[in-house]
Amino acid sequence: MNNATKRVVVPALEEILYEPIKVLDHGFIRVIDYMGDDSAIVQAARVSYGKGTKQLNQDKGLINYLLRHYHTTPFEMCDIKFHIKLPIFIARQWIRHRTASVNEYSARYSILGNEFYLPEPQNIAPQSSTNKQCRESDSLPKEVAEKVLNILEEDARNCYKHYTKLMNTDEEGNIIDDNNTGIARELARMNLTLNYYTEWYWKINLHNLLHFLRLRADPHAQYEIRVYAEKMLDIVKAWVPFTYEAFEEYRMCGANISRKGLEVIKKMISGEKVTHETSGMTKREWEELTKILK
């Protein structure tokens, strides 16, 4: 059989195709398929104004320009499909990005495996006192974290035990008690804790993937989703290195500055002393600007 293809092939991505990349304790990411590379972005962009240039440094410059000026369509020419195993509570956060095609493992048709996520002790922390949606950076004392882990593990194991008891089947689907009918899988699943693992296929174009990564690979993102995003960044780097470099330069390591912020910077450059009180900015805006300028 001749397996030759006329498609664009990225050797670095071919090396990891179908291979599970471990994330968290039981999770993974696998690249299942992809379409296009950096050249596909350039090709789509040049349709707008003719054949143009072909040298690699000029391709790189064009990609930098496109990303810097927020062009979107050329980056939509590349697609990638992942197979991802992740905790249910992270999947619910992830699915809020409504720009991908998703097909998830169904607990109506199948029995969920007995695998659940337990955080590392250093990742167990109290609620942030300044941010309603995240934890403090300092973890709980080791002995307290161990108690938390014991509760999480005990609850998860008990819930799975009751899950199989409600269905009257074990993890493999074998009947437990011939005298017991059990209830439907679609009902029994409601008893499982959110740290149990689910799986899905997730297909997305590069433009929307970069938006996802800008938010979820950010230091402020929840740790458990951020580690998935960081692995995906490595995949993007292997797949479209020019785009990755531009993305890192203009999005991940760049900054958006407001009109007032720009005025403050101009005053500072001219030697004028500017304080929060004289800046005309809110406290949070001022803190964000000073953080950028540090």
From Swiss-Prot:
**Reaction equation(s) it catalyzes:** dUMP + (6R)-5,10-methylene-5,6,7,8-tetrahydrofolate + NADPH + H(+) = dTMP + (6S)-5,6,7,8-tetrahydrofolate + NADP(+)
User: What EC number(s) does its UniProt record assign?
Assistant: 2.1.1.148
Tell me where the sequence motif ThyX motif sits in this chain: 96-106
A single GO molecular function, which one?
A: NADPH binding
Active site, per annotation: 216 (involved in ionization of n3 of dump, leading to its activation)
The cofactor note from the UniProt entry for this protein is: Binds 4 FAD per tetramer. Each FAD binding site is formed by three monomers.
The cofactor required is: FAD
Q: Where on the tree of life does the source sit, at the highest rank?
A: Bacteria
Identify the SUPFAM superfamilies for this entry.
Thymidylate synthase-complementing protein Thy1
The ThyX domain extends over 27-250
Quote the record's binding site residues for FAD. Answer: 73, 96-98, 104, 205-207, 211
Q: Could you tell me the keywords of this UniProt record?
A: FAD, Flavoprotein, Methyltransferase, NADP, Nucleotide biosynthesis, Transferase
Tell me which residues bind dUMP. 93-96, 104-108, 189, 216
Q: How does it assemble?
A: Homotetramer.
Per its database record, what is this protein's job?
A: Catalyzes the reductive methylation of 2'-deoxyuridine-5'-monophosphate (dUMP) to 2'-deoxythymidine-5'-monophosphate (dTMP) while utilizing 5,10-methylenetetrahydrofolate (mTHF) as the methyl donor, and NADPH and FADH(2) as the reductant.
List the PANTHER family hit by this protein, alphabetically. FLAVIN-DEPENDENT THYMIDYLATE SYNTHASE
Q: What is this protein called?
A: Flavin-dependent thymidylate synthase
What gene name does this entry carry? thyX
